[in-house]
């Protein structure tokens, strides 16, 4: 799991860890930022969040968002490391 402060993109959140891993694998081959899964428990259910980052600049954030959208892999949301 990534640590530290910065800007991240959350591409998806899944109850099924296999679905999260599949998306992580697809993203790893197409973006330069690190891709990782961050698991949390919400409402007694584990969610596996697929994120990329940290991303250093606003331009890189925009480029990564566009790459994900063009590949039809979701609508990434900008998040910070503590969300």
Where are these regions (language model features)?
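Long, low-complexity, acidic/serine-threonine-proline-glutamine-glycine-rich intrinsically disordered tracts
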Residues: 1-7
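Conserved short N-terminal element of RNA/RNP-binding modules in eukaryotic RBPs
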Residues: 9-13
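Extracytoplasmic
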Residues: 15-83
């Amino acid at each position: 799991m990534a640590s530290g402060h910065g800007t991240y993109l959350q591409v998806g959140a899944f109850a099924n860890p296999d679905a999260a891993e599949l998306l992580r694998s697809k993203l790893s081959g197409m973006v330069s930022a690190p891709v990782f899964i961050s698991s949390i428990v919400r409402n007694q259910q584990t969610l596996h969040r697929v994120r990329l980052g940290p991303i250093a600049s606003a331009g890189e954030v925009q480029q990564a968002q566009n790459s994900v959208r063009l590949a039809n892999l979701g609508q990434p949301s900008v998040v910070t490391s503590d969300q």
